[in-house]
Amino acid sequence: MCLSALILVSLAAFTAGAGHPSSPPMVDTVQGKVLGKYISLEGFTQPVAVFLGVPFAKPPLGSLRFAPPQPAEPWSSVKNATSYPPMCFQDPVTGQIVNDLLTNRKEKIPLQFSEDCLYLNIYTPADLTKSDRLPVMVWIHGGGLVLGGASTYDGLVLSTHENVVVVVIQYRLGIWGFFSTGDEHSRGNWGHLDQVAALHWVQDNIAKFGGDPGSVTIFGESAGGESVSVLVLSPLAKNLFQRAISESGVALTAGLVKKNTRPLAEKIAVISGCKNTTSAAMVHCLRQKTEEELLGTTLKLNLFKLDLHGDSRQSHPFVPTVLDGVLLPKMPEEILAEKNFNTVPYIVGINKQEFGWILPTMMNYPPSDVKLDQMTAMSLLKKSSFLLNLPEDAIAVAIEKYLRDKDYTGRNKDQLLELIGDVVFGVPSVIVSRGHRDAGAPTYMYEFQYSPSFSSEMKPDTVVGDHGDEIYSVFGAPILRGGTSEEEINLSKMMMKFWANFARNGNPNGQGLPHWPEYDQKEGYLQIGATTQQAQKLKEKEVAFWTELLAKKQLPTEHTEL
């Protein structure tokens, strides 16, 4: 192993060198040879072969902007796959902040961004000289379909501890990934098509890395969980995976799936200085823009932000998944009702306080010490219509139910955030789980209830199970970073074991683990935290309340969420 590669990995949690083969790992993919590096986790003799920045599609530049991904071009020399690829274009400041908040690494890596970003990272503990066939776990990152990247998530611990091949993929984001004119000129969902292309690449190549293409689990968090859910529903992803895990995000998650995004396309065109007369004119003009110009448009869209002063109906904080007739032939709720989807074993979970701190902070909600009476709450929820998709008269009924204190008593802010968390995450996750169960597929649910020690110091101690908190456990942050309690290390080991057992055989249960009941008509689920135990009927009352309320007060326009 070369000295520079050693320096890269000689961090506190690693030891590089002992027990490594004499030469770095090399794999011959369909497109050409890739050279990786060996890394060992402290205390483990078996090294993991790591390949970073492996291309799975042609760079989506020029005429391939707003077009389906094309297979990567072959190469004749050996491609060096030992450094992190650039992340897909996004707001660089927010992208770096989110990376630093969510990463399981100890070290911080300065991020690079590019439109040329269709790469994946592979972590394999397999002996590449033998024909191992290990389970494959493909991670799809979150970030509201506008932020995030592969290299935030180091697969070393999960791969080492559970003897699985971990693949972390990237996909086009924001305007680049989801711009849709609603017709043949730019159907949209380019980012999801990138995810499908990455899964095809895994089918064609992962056996060379010691992975079993017949045992692929897709898992993701937030918009990554929504992406997993979309792929479960999509005919394009049939037979590309055998199991699925959605953490804090499903295809019914508010704001992330729309029937029609034409108004947003026209707004993007106008901000970019393009005429929005016809679809062809918009697409042609936007393809001429530099990536920096489109980044300027992205920043002007104020993605992920609550606009407290403008017209909320004109607000577009997401560039969402769209009903395109190809990836999504119908709206998610219709596909679920028809039971015509990929009925693979499925874990769906939420965190106890999904709208506890990180999301309201990023979206510019007032800080927790702001006094909140019912009138202020009503105003905030009206401004949140982009996220909640609630008719105005439903908001008043919901406030009556959730905000039980007429005047400010200190609890109203928490109750408002609970309301938003239920609408955006809790209720949709239960409805998707029920639909999956009713289609006859093995389904498991969890609620994560733990406050990791790696959280930002700015997060209030009262927030337990914030959005994204489970990622630290799933990717072994307590082991990789060190300096944490035995309880937190054991929680991480347990969650990795649950996830990997599920990847191995479609059932998370195993020796030495608390029993996780299947989500059947009794609706048993697992509460995961300092104490992990079975419970029943997650969010049952909330689902009943919102289902009944929205049935009575159906929106006259599109109804995309609950």
UniProtKB/Swiss-Prot annotation:
A GO term, aspect molecular function: all-trans-retinyl-palmitate hydrolase, all-trans-retinol forming activity
Coiled-coil residue windows: none
Subcellular location, record wording: Endoplasmic reticulum lumen; Microsome membrane
Top EC class for this record: hydrolase
Glycosites: N80, N276, N490
Entry GO terms, CC: endoplasmic reticulum lumen; membrane
Active site: S222, E354, H467
Catalytic activity, EC: 3.1.1.1
Statement: the UniProt record of this protein carries the keyword Hydrolase: yes
Residues in the signal sequence: 1-19
PROSITE patterns: CARBOXYLESTERASE_B_1 (PS00122), CARBOXYLESTERASE_B_2 (PS00941)
Pfam short name (any one): COesterase
Substrates-to-products reaction catalysed: a carboxylic ester + H2O = an alcohol + a carboxylate + H(+); all-trans-retinyl hexadecanoate + H2O = all-trans-retinol + hexadecanoate + H(+)
This protein's record includes keyword Protein biosynthesis: no
Keyword terms, alphabetized: Disulfide bond, Endoplasmic reticulum, Glycoprotein, Hydrolase, Membrane, Microsome, Serine esterase, Signal
S-S bonds: C88-C117, C274-C285
Sequence motif Prevents secretion from ER, residues: 559-562
Similarity-based family: Belongs to the type-B carboxylesterase/lipase family.
Role played: Involved in the detoxification of xenobiotics and in the activation of ester and amide prodrugs. Hydrolyzes retinyl esters.
Protein name: Carboxylesterase 1E
